[in-house]
UniProtKB/Swiss-Prot annotation:
It is found in: Cell membrane. The lineage of its organism: Bacteria, Pseudomonadati, Pseudomonadota, Gammaproteobacteria, Enterobacterales. This is NADH-quinone oxidoreductase subunit C/D. Its EC number is 7.1.1.-. One of its GO terms (cellular component) is plasma membrane. It is a peripheral membrane protein.
Length: 600
């Protein structure tokens, strides 16, 4: 058993615990399991982090799951290589750690459970008995760190190819290709890779036949148009009926979390745009907010309003593509061409403000890159006058079509309990009747100052209800944009804090000290104090978040990117078993995902 109480700064730790003793769940844990078996880490995440020994993991999970106000959703699960982390004297001894991020809907609060591990004992019990969505998260943690989860139903690689060697998020695994031998794919290696892609049903617990039927196995993807990206689903079929299926991801993996370890806090911003490549500035927001927490930077009001305005423009842009491609998947072509015309109007506005279109990389640590250009309000007003009438066209000509309704209502249904079990967020969760929208429940960037409604469904999430939720969300985003237009404050667009990156040019030209700071922050990167922070936002496809660990350097020690599309695809088999292939196509169109968001 690992000693959870660090030897240094014991007085400080007791003082910190006393300051946070009003948190009832911490008291409940300490009372039930004993203070000597739990260590409370104080961070800037905004929720308690409790370190426990791995022998208590399942019991602690059950305890939190069965509280009167339970922690019902496993939001995230991943690992950290602690071996070269600086300034961790106040933490339990660990070579690696695994964290379990849980959410209580009734409390509207989170808790993170951390388990320290030594390098010679990287074994944990699986969490899949409590939370079925732990399956993929544990597979990815093994894939990236080599941590074994006992009794996992299928602990195999999920992001990297089955032939891959090593665990990429370990600190001794180089992030640069120049440190490896040049890649060469000879015929023998190519055969090996092709063999690795062959689907073997027995490895997934599937039978090739039963007493009466010999099943057919069909590859849908990884380049099928209805797969919406480089994504493969292997279907076990009895005729047209889906007996079971296995989603296969990882084809779009780019090592986004690894890249964060070799980019400065500032230079990583362009990479965030490409996590969910349709979201643009929406992707930048949780990252810069998390860095600002670490740096203790307060953002000017004008910058907050600009960030909200840009986020809602990209939300509408993404939703329009989703709605039109959903209609196309059901069989209607025309709306997708109209949608691209409407999205062009949004891109014209975004380009006028940021100078770029899909990936502006425009938010900054402490604000935004530039002030709004002259005439931005005219372009925005023209769009606000145009879009509501256009949205009615989509509804009346396509979404009220009896064939579309028949093909999507009652298809791929799940309820609130099932959604929470699988970590579903966004429109899929709200269609079950739960109005969990981070902008309302946990406001950020000034969203508490805006008037808007959260569209919800009647209790069952199906393909039709999910798409109609998105339609209503466009109306609400238009209402938020109108408030931004009418109430845009004056003042600076960037904080004057010394850690704001880059510093304002006006200050740089005034004194040599600011010039030196500017030079260091642009060339070397800002030095962010050691701590941990977390920020979730309501992104275009659900909840997106960044969990950052700084050890006092110019680069992140660990960047964990939790995206909504990853759990949404994991849920597919539980929803679609017993349905037809044609139903799967409609279901995939109703999820709203892109593979860059899944694979990172």
């Amino acid at each position: 058993m690992i000693d959870l109480m660090p030897k240094k700064n014991t007085f400080l730790l007791k003082k910190k615990y006393k300051e946070d003793s009003n948190n009832s769940v911490i008291n409940d844990l300490f009372d039930f399991f004993g203070k000597e078996f739990c260590f409370h880490q104080i961070t800037l995440t905004g929720f308690p982090i409790i370190w426990i020994d791995k022998t208590l993991l399942i019991e602690v999970g059950k305890f939190l799951y069965h509280l009167s106000q339970p922690y019902i959703m496993l939001y995230d699960l991943h690992g950290v290589d602690e071996r070269i982390r600086l300034h961790r004297e106040d933490l339990p001894k660990a070579d690696f750690s695994v964290f379990y991020h849980l959410i209580s809907i009734e409390r509207n609060s989170d808790i993170m459970i951390k388990v320290p591990l030594l390098e010679n004992d990287l074994i944990l019990p699986t969490f899949t008995g409590l939370f079925p969505n732990a399956n993929w998260y544990e597979r990815e943690t093994w894939d990236m760190f080599g941590i074994i989860f006992n009794n996992h139903p299928n602990l195999t690689r999920i992001i990297m190819p089955s032939t891959w060697k090593g665990h990429p998020l370990r600190k001794n695994y180089s992030a640069r290709a120049t440190e490896y031998e040049p890649f060469f794919l000879n015929e023998q290696k190519e055969d090996l890779e092709m063999e690795g892609l062959k689907f073997k049903p027995e490895l997934w617990g599937m039978k090739r036949k039963n007493d009466n039927v010999e099943f057919m196995f069909l590859n849908l993807g990884p380049n099928h148009p209805s797969a919406h990206g480089a994504f493969r689903i292997v279907l076990q079929l009895d005729g047209e009926n889906i007996v079971d299926c296995v989603p296969d991801i990882g084809y779009h993996h780019r090592g986004a979390e690894k890249m964060a370890e070799r980019q400065s806090w500032h230079s990583y911003i362009p990479y965030t745009d490409r996590i969910e490549y349709l979201g643009g500035c929406v992707n930048e927001l949780p990252y810069v907010l998390a860095v600002e927490k670490l740096a203790n930077i307060s953002v000017p009001e004008k910058a907050e309003v600009i960030r909200v305005m840009m986020s809602e423009l990209f939300r509408i842009n993404s939703h329009l593509l989703y709605i039109s491609t959903f209609i196309q998947d059901v069989g209607c072509m025309t709306p997708v061409f109209f949608a691209f015309t409407d999205r062009q109007k949004i891109y014209d506005l975004i380009e006028a403000i940021t100078g770029a279109r899909m990936h502006p990389a425009w938010f900054r640590i402490g604000g935004v890159a530039n002030d709004l250009p002259q005439g931005w309000n005219i372009l925005l007003k023209e769009f606000l006058d145009w879009m509501p009438k256009r949205l009615k066209y989509y509804i009346n000509t396509a979404l009220k079509n009896s064939i579309l309704i028949h093909r999507s209502k009652g298809i791929a249904e799940y309820n609130k309990k099932e959604a929470l079990q699988w970590g579903v967020t966004g429109a899929g969760l709200r269609a079950t009747g739960l109005n969990f929208d981070v902008r309302k429940w946990r406001p950020y960037s000034g969203y508490q100052n805006y008037t808007f409604e959260v569209p919800v469904g009647s209790g069952i999430s199906d393909c039709y209800s999910r798409v109609m939720i998105k339609v209503e969300e466009i109306y609400q985003s238009l209402f938020i944009l109108k408030q931004c237009l009418c109430n845009m404050p004056s003042g600076p667009f960037k904080s004057e804090d010394s850690l704001t990156t880059p510093p304002s040019k006006e200050c740089v030209l005034q004194n040599i000290e600011t010039m030196i700071t500017h030079f260091l922050q642009v060339s070397w990167g800002p030095v962010i104090p050691e701590n941990e922070s977390f920020q979730m936002i309501e992104a275009t496809k659900g909840i997106n978040s960044y969990y950052l660990i700084s050890d006092g350097g110019t680069m992140s020690y660990r960047t964990r990117i939790r995206t909504p599309s990853f759990p949404h695809l994991q849920q597919i088999p539980s929803v679609i078993r017993g349905s037809l292939i044609s139903d799967l196509i409609v279901y995939l169109g109703s999820i709203d995902f892109v593979m860059s968001d899944v694979d990172r």
